[in-house]
Amino acid sequence: MKPIPATPDHLGQHQESPRRKDKGEAESERQRTRERLEATLAGLAELGYLRHRQELLVKSALTPGAPTHGDTATRAGDTPRSLEEKFLEDNILLLKKQLNCLRKRDAGLLSQLHELDKQINDLKIDVEKTEEHLETDSRPSSGFYELSDGTSGSLSNSSNSVFSECLSSCHSSTCFCNPLETSLNLTDGQAKSADDFLEWLDYRDSQHETGTVRRSFSAPHSNSVDVAADVHPKYQCDLVSKNGNDIYRYPSPLHAVAVQSPMFLLSVMGNIKAEEPEEEIGPNDNDDCIVPELDHLKDEDSFLHQSSLCSLPLSSGKKMDGYILSIIQKKAHPVRTNKPRTSVNADPGKGILRHGSICVKQTGGVSQSSTVNLKNSKQTCLHSTGMISVDNSTYPSLKQCSKESLSEQLESKRMPSISTYPSCNVNELQSQNNSRNTVKSVCQGLARGSVAMTSNVQKENVTPNAPTNLSNASSSACNGSPRESTQMSALLPQEIKVVPPVKKISPKNTLLSYHASSSFDERPPLDFKSEGSSSQSLDEGLLVNAHYIPAQQQGVKLHKNIKNVKIVKSSTLKHRANVQYVAENGSQTLKEKSKAVGKKCRFPEDLDTNKKVKKSTPRTKKTSHPNFEPAVVGRNPVAVRSGIKSHGQPKDVVLAKPKHKRGDYRRWKSSAEISYEEALRRARRRAQREMMGVYAQVPFPYASPYAYIASDSEYSAECESLFHSTVVDTSEDEQSNYTTNCFGDSESSLSEVEFVGESTTSSDTDESGGLIWSQFVHTLPMQATATAELQTTAKAFVKIKASHNLKKKILRFRSGSLKLMTTV
């Protein structure tokens, strides 16, 4: 019986699979019927042989005529004895050969085969159920079950499994009869019960002793001529029960019945053509082969086979191997589900966490201004920072940042506002409109309305409106620290409602306009935690209360600041920040004064204005700073502590949290695989070494040159916190490329622009000049559309004194300042 191979058509074509299945079932049914008929014929032939042999025995006993009872008994005894001797000799030879064959076999193979039979039993049951289910199932067939049907060569029903166990035990009992191997290779699509077989076993137990054979001529393995001609030799071997205790001798009535049983049929199927002609032995030869005296060979009786079995051990072994291989193949190719073995982590938070500047939380602003929606805040955040704003759920740390930003905003609202802002508001509105329309307008607004913006922001801080807070939020978003970014995002929603047109502007213009608008619109208290002292100086500047300064005056000083920037030389932003912390407590106060009370971070315009304000009114700085001191403490205790440490004056304490911020930034950097701490330490060391020199360069007209520089230059760093501080720190170490690349292109470009605008004003008095880089970047996009003032400022920006590596990169990519960091 040939198994039906699983062809692609069978596996894939829905229409043909049922047709092929039906065809296979019909063929298997015909095969089973054929086998059953053959088994029945074999049983009948065996019974006929037994009857014929019995007749011969009776005739032999009665032939002498009428001898005396004793003579008859004696002759009968002599005749059987001579026959028994012959049979015994032949059987002994066969047994020896079989034992030799068994020695060559691996004993473990038989046990494994037995286990496989058990497994096959389970498989047969499963296949049986599956086939029944598939008959009514519209799903395409995989071909696995078709392979297992009656024509595929696998045992598929409980009867077969039971009988296969029998055969396996027979095998273990050294039964080399081909039926074993054939049965192992046979398959049946019909479920057949083993009850009949069990009944036969019980009947045999009642008739015979277990494992013993009566001393009679019915025992020998012999085939009549009819049997040899009509019955396949596979039906002419002994059947052994699964436990090996029950043996059905070939020429016995029970054997004939068992051969006809469906179970036996299934177990024996498929081996017909494997038999060799030697099995077709005449009745006389077979009678000679087996003798009743084999009873004493009880253990060896289980090995009794046809005389030809001894010559077939090799073929039987091959069949067994083939059967085992077939089982292994079927078990080695189980049906597999389409479910992917691995799950793809689509959590955007993990990838975003690597970019510290991306972490911007915008929910904080919602509470302050219900009119602003998160979407607008996100867009504003993107424009200001050039980064993707992250949802609150993305960063757990952002939640804390948003909370802090809210508290800071509330405090900023509480802060007293300076009464000199009406004109500033007008200027601010104009600057906002200009920034919305064009970058040029934005540049003009920056020149004219930085002070106005600052004063206006102070007003806004006093009022419950969150626009100032939004500005702070945006600036904090520019900063890399998660907390600051969160604050920025919180504030951005409100600020957005004022600056929505900025979205329409081109990337560079948008950034510039956003800076202008944010600086003009609001200077909300934002904690910019740039690395090193930049964040501290920014915070100080935020805390300072500044008197309103006319926009024109601010513009004039802006030019001056730019010139100063050219002159100033600082190794890094951090260095400048350190100098500012040490020497610019007073200037910081002035800067803060120029800023709105609630402002924490300053935009480039505000920074310049603050510087000018500080220069022009150091008194105001000093006076206003005390007003901010409580707010500073309330807003950010950590910043206050850091400010106290750096300045030694709680009054001048800045909200900046350099260490804490550095920790946050380092955390982001570590996720981006950037060793930020090392760069920061190097920047600090450089700043300390150059602190004295930078300090000398700082304009002393301000009571606290540090406050001026720190607020401006460090504000730039703060706004750029993640990006700029990282660039500065690493650029000195010539690692800016790596750091910059870690940030997104949009992120770095946006941060760059913002930083430029901010550091334009801040680095005017920036002794270290480390922040001039950002000024340069900011002014480059502004120069095209900026006024003459901005153009002059741009020139100053061109001469940036940052790390040599950073400066080189900036000059190289002047035209594409937005893409400076990413391209570098």
From Swiss-Prot:
Coiled coil: 19-47
Keyword terms, alphabetized: Coiled coil, Cytoplasm, Developmental protein, Nucleus, Wnt signaling pathway
Region ranges (Disordered): 1-34, 61-80, 131-150, 454-487, 516-536
Localization in the cell: Cytoplasm; Nucleus
Annotated stretches, region: Interaction with tcf7l1: 2-343
One Pfam short name: Dapper
One GO term (biological process): Wnt signaling pathway
Biased composition (Basic and acidic residues): 11-34, 520-530
GO CC entries: cytoplasm; nucleus
Position of sequence motif PDZ-binding: 821-824
Role according to the record: Involved in regulation of intracellular signaling pathways during development. Specifically thought to play a role in canonical and/or non-canonical Wnt signaling pathways through interaction with DSH (Dishevelled) family proteins. Binds to dvl2 and regulates the degradation of ctnnb1/beta-catenin, thereby modulating the transcriptional activation of target genes of the Wnt signaling pathway. May also bind to and directly stimulate the activity of tcf7l1.
Family of this protein: Belongs to the dapper family.
Subunit-structure text: Interacts with dbf4, dvl2 and tcf7l1.
Domains: entry comment: The C-terminal PDZ-binding motif may mediate interaction with the PDZ domains of DSH (Dishevelled) family proteins.
Name of the protein described by the UniProt record: Dapper 1
Native organism: Xenopus tropicalis
